[in-house]
């Protein structure tokens, strides 16, 4: 298998895309055979995106009361959780958190809201005002994740200064009905297309450990390749009490790393970040993400769960002799 991996690596570096069948073969590797996979995934990453690390941070700008029934989500109105519930925060709060994110070393800052979408009145106006101020007052790059949007909203965000629109597919099309039944997968795909049409970059990934099969992870990666997204956040389920998946078993650290490597093999030139759930799922192997193909991570807190201190992540990078890159590079 090592010879096969080496041959695939050469083809990928020369600009060829691996096939669905080849990706499935890689997904079946296990045990010590995974180490050569991590090694070549790292080589591919360094060839296409270098060895620097992209750091991002977010604000949960509007929390809870979401009408969607995503099985993993603490903010769904269909679940009874301890997640905070509040309306869209004010402009000053969004800007202040951007300053804090920049202070912590992030180069990209995401404004995230719960719900299917935002309204085009006061909510959109407030977010656009905040984005303009963030552009004026900081050196951080603003992004937004506001749910399903239409072209008019996408243009307004682009005009305000939003660099990247974030919208996850969450999982493979074939598994999506097991995760969410309140909207269709194609609506998420269309949002990605709309954001790109408006001139924004697109950050689009998903969450693993929902009960999907490893071949379905490959399926999702191939969909992202077809959509030609710019960056891919990989999240790993941190089961929240009160959600449908509260009793789910975490996937192993090695399976997390294998998933990262698979995505790098399928999406060689994309920015791939490991975000939510890394502390819970990777545990002592968190630092290995950067040697399995990841090129970034989120620092600070997540939407409804606490991340570790930014100082700890900076120490991790220092120990690995890695430095941070600007997300616009």
Swiss-Prot record:
<comment type="pathway">
    <text>Cofactor biosynthesis; biotin biosynthesis; biotin from 7,8-diaminononanoate: step 2/2.</text>
</comment>
<feature type="binding site">
    <location>
        <position position="73"/>
    </location>
    <ligand>
        <name>[4Fe-4S] cluster</name>
    </ligand>
</feature>
<keyword id="KW-0808">Transferase</keyword>
<feature type="domain" description="Radical SAM core">
    <location>
        <begin position="48"/>
        <end position="278"/>
    </location>
</feature>
<comment type="function">
    <text>Catalyzes the conversion of dethiobiotin (DTB) to biotin by the insertion of a sulfur atom into dethiobiotin via a radical-based mechanism.</text>
</comment>
<keyword id="KW-0949">S-adenosyl-L-methionine</keyword>
<dbReference type="InterPro" id="IPR006638">
    <property type="entry name" value="Elp3/MiaA/NifB-like_rSAM"/>
</dbReference>
<keyword id="KW-0001">2Fe-2S</keyword>
<keyword id="KW-0093">Biotin biosynthesis</keyword>
<keyword id="KW-0408">Iron</keyword>
<dbReference type="GO" id="GO:0004076">
    <property type="term" value="F:biotin synthase activity"/>
</dbReference>
<dbReference type="GO" id="GO:0005506">
    <property type="term" value="F:iron ion binding"/>
</dbReference>
<dbReference type="InterPro" id="IPR013785">
    <property type="entry name" value="Aldolase_TIM"/>
</dbReference>
<dbReference type="Pfam" id="PF06968">
    <property type="entry name" value="BATS"/>
</dbReference>
<dbReference type="InterPro" id="IPR024177">
    <property type="entry name" value="Biotin_synthase"/>
</dbReference>
<comment type="subunit">
    <text>Homodimer.</text>
</comment>
<feature type="binding site">
    <location>
        <position position="70"/>
    </location>
    <ligand>
        <name>[4Fe-4S] cluster</name>
    </ligand>
</feature>
<dbReference type="GO" id="GO:0009102">
    <property type="term" value="P:biotin biosynthetic process"/>
</dbReference>
<dbReference type="GO" id="GO:0051539">
    <property type="term" value="F:4 iron, 4 sulfur cluster binding"/>
</dbReference>
<protein>
    <recommendedName>
        <fullName>Biotin synthase</fullName>
        <ecNumber>2.8.1.6</ecNumber>
    </recommendedName>
</protein>
<dbReference type="InterPro" id="IPR010722">
    <property type="entry name" value="BATS_dom"/>
</dbReference>
<keyword id="KW-0004">4Fe-4S</keyword>
<keyword id="KW-0479">Metal-binding</keyword>
<dbReference type="InterPro" id="IPR007197">
    <property type="entry name" value="rSAM"/>
</dbReference>
<feature type="binding site">
    <location>
        <position position="66"/>
    </location>
    <ligand>
        <name>[4Fe-4S] cluster</name>
    </ligand>
</feature>
<keyword id="KW-0411">Iron-sulfur</keyword>
<feature type="binding site">
    <location>
        <position position="203"/>
    </location>
    <ligand>
        <name>[2Fe-2S] cluster</name>
    </ligand>
</feature>
<dbReference type="InterPro" id="IPR002684">
    <property type="entry name" value="Biotin_synth/BioAB"/>
</dbReference>
<dbReference type="GO" id="GO:0051537">
    <property type="term" value="F:2 iron, 2 sulfur cluster binding"/>
</dbReference>
<dbReference type="Pfam" id="PF04055">
    <property type="entry name" value="Radical_SAM"/>
</dbReference>
<feature type="binding site">
    <location>
        <position position="143"/>
    </location>
    <ligand>
        <name>[2Fe-2S] cluster</name>
    </ligand>
</feature>
<comment type="similarity">
    <text>Belongs to the radical SAM superfamily. Biotin synthase family.</text>
</comment>
